């Protein structure tokens, strides 16, 4: 668990038991009935934060009824209590999470320190802030919303509000920009106080490893990439390279090593002098063998656009690490982009850890309760549904081949469509969604994937109409409810078809959860084959396939948890160093550490930024090659932590002397400082592929086993 998480608690021990929760709920409902008798003028006196959270929630419940004409159900009030108590509330699809969060948000906002309400995209941030604004305003609370493309002044105004809706990426980029400000007035955020996380499993788990990066300046394009790409195109699977049984790593065979050495005339590919070439070859091999167009990325407008594997959407402003990004660009023969120098970086996990108060909500949290507890110190409270769930979840249908499975899916779509029921078909990729679309000739349908994600809200809004057929990637899993059209409940409601099982049970459950909202009828069925990627990767081909898949998903989730916890040990030391260096920088920026002149202040800030950027580059290089130390029997983590500590001590020791040197050389009043660069996020390679050097090391280990490098 993070050392710096100081989570707020209401009286969590007593609130844990269902009996206590029911008692609190009764008191709140009784108080709500009393408050209904108050006039608006009398009611506004309750705008101040009450001493008791139950009283405060009752006030907000009544305000919602008066302002936006929405009555809160018991389950929504229970969810609000859980979030006020610093928990993750699991509230099923269609149960009204947006409204349920408002009493908890208002409770924290009344402390006067502001609340970040983080959701998964700009659309939901804008929608929810506008929808709930009358409630907050009646309570005397201001509301802001951060959107991509806003000016610094617009952002500053939004962050000064009592409640600020935003995505974690936008908040993170603003945080990184603030840390590079040359004047205090340039900063847009105030100190973090509390965060309420919508779709908490997506933000706190699925995207937790994604680093937010701010970069500036330019480095030269990779002149080697084109030549390496041409050579890689001549390599053949099994002959020149092998892919591991899970499809996560690729490495050269002896024949492949010889082929590359002859093509480049470089001698021993494993010589230190060839490290840059070897890394470029591994990145190119990875791009060709493991990353697939219309599955992992799109090519649009002459650029590579990665697809978020969990959401099925374009991952905007996101890149792979430099070498792999360049390799994919070379593979698709698009213009190679220049790479910026990294000035600052933070993962979403570390960013959210900076909030002293934290809570959240989602429709799928229980399966990850161990990770919420061990990583964030957050308890998951499962909230019952308002109405009994009557959706029918049929057993999986198992086939020997993908071809048989796909035909069965098409047959089921036709059968349900003839009955007049709407059908939602969930697919794993853009490629799969378009393949099924092509098979449905003669059946009117809509396809939703990363190519047309801007139409998501409109397409999903029509998906519950009689006879509607919607084929979608994971995009249709969150954010927008599928409401049933007239007469659809009598026909049996929405039927959901899953065309494969995913590595995470949560993704499957999100798809199922599109049907049967708030007691509506509905059904779901998953179709799987022994040729599905999930099963092929993990060698599952037994007759009891459904049981095997369930067990496999639990094992994969446990493995991913272990990996994330292990990788946090690598990142935690850098995060502590970042906090230390930024504290010093902020003191200089705000005048806590007085300087003899404005020039000296500017030079000091620019020097800190420059040395920190150098430190990040050195740490990145260290981590990229740290796997080599295990070849000598040493522990990579221990060696990494030791070296990073020594490197940071060197940085701190250089600061004063470097500032003095640069100040002595400054002839322009300190104005010659770096300009802020562009910002982007890039795909983490911690899992599943590993770093380039890790892949090289795996190949080298195999080579040593088969023939001695030194013999």
Q: In which residue ranges do the predicted regions lie?
A:
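Conserved P-loop NTPase motor core
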Residues: 1-543, 582
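Extended, charged helical/alpha-beta scaffold domains that provide interaction surfaces
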Residues: 298-305, 311-318, 518-519, 534, ...
């Amino acid at each position: 668990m993070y050392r710096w998480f100081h989570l707020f608690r209401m009286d969590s021990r007593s609130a844990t038991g269902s009996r206590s929760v029911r008692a609190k709920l009764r008191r709140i409902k009784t108080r709500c009935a009393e408050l209904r008798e108050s006039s608006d003028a009398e009611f506004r006196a309750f705008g101040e934060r009450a001493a008791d959270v139950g009283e405060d929630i009752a006030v907000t419940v009544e305000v919602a009824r008066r302002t936006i004409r929405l009555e809160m159900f018991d389950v929504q009030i229970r969810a609000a209590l859980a979030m006020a108590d610093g928990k993750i509330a699991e509230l099923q699809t269609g149960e009204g999470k947006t409204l349920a969060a408002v009493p908890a948000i208002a409770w924290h906002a009344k402390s006067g320190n502001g609340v970040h309400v983080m959701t998964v995209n700009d659309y939901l941030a804008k929608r929810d802030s506008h929808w709930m604004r009358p409630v907050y305003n009646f309570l005397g609370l201001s509301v802001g919303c951060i959107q991509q493309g806003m000016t610094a002044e617009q952002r500053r105004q939004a962050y000064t509000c009592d409640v600020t809706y935003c995505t974690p990426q936008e908040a993170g980029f603003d945080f990184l920009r603030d840390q590079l400000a040359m004047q205090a007035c340039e900063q847009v955020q105030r100190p973090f106080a509390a965060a309420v996380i919508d779709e908490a499993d997506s933000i706190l788990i699925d995207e937790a490893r994604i680093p937010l990066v701010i970069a500036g300046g330019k480095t030269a394009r990779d002149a080697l990439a084109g030549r390496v790409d041409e050579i890689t195109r001549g390599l053949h699977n099994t002959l020149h390279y092998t892919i591991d049984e899970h499809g996560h790593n690729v490495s050269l065979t002896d024949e492949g090593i010889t082929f590359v050495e002859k093509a480049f005339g470089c001698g021993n590919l494993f010589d230190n002098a060839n490290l840059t070439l070897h890394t470029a070859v591994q990145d190119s091999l990875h791009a060709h063998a493991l990353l697939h167009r219309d599955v992992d990325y799109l090519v649009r407008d002459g650029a590579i656009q990665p697809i978020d594997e969990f959401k099925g959407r374009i991952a905007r402003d996101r890149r792979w690490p430099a070498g792999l990004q360049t390799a994919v660009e070379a593979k698709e023969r698009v213009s190679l982009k220049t790479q910026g120098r990294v000035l600052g970086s933070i993962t979403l996990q570390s960013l959210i850890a900076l909030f002293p108060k934290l809570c959240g909500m989602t429709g799928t949290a229980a399966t990850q309760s161990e990770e919420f507890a061990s990583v964030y110190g957050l308890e998951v409270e499962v909230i019952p549904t308002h109405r009994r769930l009557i959706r029918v979840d049929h057993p999986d249908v198992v086939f020997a081949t993908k071809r048989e499975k796909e035909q069965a899916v098409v047959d089921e779509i036709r059968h349900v469509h003839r009955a007049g029921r709407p059908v939602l078909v969930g697919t794993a990729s853009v490629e799969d969604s378009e393949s099924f679309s092509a098979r449905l000739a003669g059946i009117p349908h809509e396809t939703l994937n990363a190519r047309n994600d801007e139409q998501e809200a409109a397409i999903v809004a029509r998906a519950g109409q009689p006879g509607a057929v919607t084929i979608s990637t994971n995009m249709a899993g969150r954010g927008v409810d599928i409401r049933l059209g007239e007469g659809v409940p009598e026909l049996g409601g929405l039927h959901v078809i899953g065309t494969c099982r995913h590595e995470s049970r949560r993704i499957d459950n999100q798809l199922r959860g599109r049907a049967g909202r708030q007691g509506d009828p509905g059904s779901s069925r998953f179709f799987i084959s022994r040729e599905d990627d999930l099963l092929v990767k993990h060698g599952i081909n037994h007759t009891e396939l459904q049981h095997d898949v369930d067990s496999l998903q639990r094992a994969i989730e446990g493995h991913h948890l272990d990996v994330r916890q292990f990788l946090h040990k690598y990142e935690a030391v850098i995060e502590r160093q970042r906090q230390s260096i930024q504290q010093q920088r902020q003191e200089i920026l705000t005048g806590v550490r007085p300087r003899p002149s404005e020039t000296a202040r500017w030079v000091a800030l620019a020097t800190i930024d420059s040395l920190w950027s150098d430190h990040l580059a050195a740490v990145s290089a260290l981590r990229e090659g740290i796997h080599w130390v295990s070849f000598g029997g040493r522990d990579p983590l221990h060696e990494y932590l030791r070296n990073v500590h020594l490197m940071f001590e060197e940085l701190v020791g250089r600061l004063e002397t470097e500032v003095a040197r640069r100040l002595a050389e400054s002839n322009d009043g300190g104005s010659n400082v770096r300009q802020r660069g562009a910002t982007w996020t890039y795909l983490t390679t911690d899992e599943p592929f590993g770093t380039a050097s890790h892949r090289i090391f795996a190949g080298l280990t195999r080579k040593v086993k088969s023939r001695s490098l030194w013999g």
